[in-house]
Amino acid sequence: MKRMNHRLSLGAVSLAVLALAGCASNAPGVNTPTRPSSSFAVPGLEKPAEVLVDRWGVPHLYAGTLYDAFVAQGFIAARDRLWQMDLWRKRGLGEMAKDFGPAWVESDRAARAVLYRGDMYREWLAYGSDAKRVAEAFTAGVNAYVAQVRAKPALLPTEFALLGYQPATWSPEDVVRIRHHGLTLNFSSEVDRARAFCAGAPGAKADWLRRELDPPVTPKVPEGFDPCNLPVAELRAAYLRATDAPRFTKENTRVGMNAGASSAPVALLPGSAEAIAAKAEQDEAAQGDPTAAYGSNNWVIAPKLTSTGRPILANDPHRAHGAPSLRYMTHLSAPGMDAIGAGEPFLPGLSIGHNGTIAF
């Protein structure tokens, strides 16, 4: 049996969290360790759910319905990573200046320039049939925990007290509108495509030299647009301004009123204009030949070539390391679903993991 450290019960009804300090045993004469547990009322749950937290801190979520699993996931992710999640949302929506001051206006402007602003009705239709309902369930769980910490400020992570602000509530659209945290290749590819077009002779398929297009696509230049006159350095600088991780310093923003007199000054500063420009120039130089090709690294070893007789899948998702980690481990168990793996704390579901049959 897994070693568990904490149990949590959730429900509109209730959600229960259990932590098992040791390995449970039914053997005679063996004492079962104390198992601290808590229960919470979580709006949005249709049936009671249970969360078992193992000794590594991984939550194992057991729900009565598929969507309840995502409500529980949002609640537990917020309980474990609330400040990280709130900062991710604020950064992506361009709302940093609201709480951190005018030093963030330009980075907010850049973030909003690349934020998805299309027709959300059509956008939801482009996903799986239940994608919106999953996002609604997940954000309901996040908001349930946000409501809990607002009612009990002692539960707020220290960062909120230091910076003197409250976590925001989420909408389902927040989950899909923010697309530029660490995902940069589409932006850089558009710039490189324009450079390749201008580097080739008229009518040449220069983009095919940069990257094989499958299925075949013929790039078309919009009427009135001159791809050879792009302010490449300025574009890269703007995108860096929108996506670079926030930096903490001691020079700008004072601590919040609730932080205590002995707290050292804390500031959130975006990169300076000079630093952003310098980094953009470095990135520009690193791009080298705009016709250069790129590869990736996803590979599989067949069962007949492994010692276990099972296939091995290896993949690098190309995401940056950070603290707190970008990855968030979760086990989701509900009717029709039983999988464990890593996702991101601000997104429902799993990105990398396995169920009882396959790895993905």
Language-model regions: role of each:
Residues 16-17, 221:
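Residue-level signal for mature regions of secreted extracellular proteins and peptides
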Residues 26-312, 317, 323, 343, ...:
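Substrate-recognition/specificity elements adjacent to catalytic centers across diverse enzyme folds
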Residues 148, 333-337:
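Secondary-structure transition/capping motifs at alpha-helix termini
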Residues 318-332:
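Short active-site loop/helix that positions an aromatic residue
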Residues 336-360:
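Compact, glycine/acidic-enriched structural inserts
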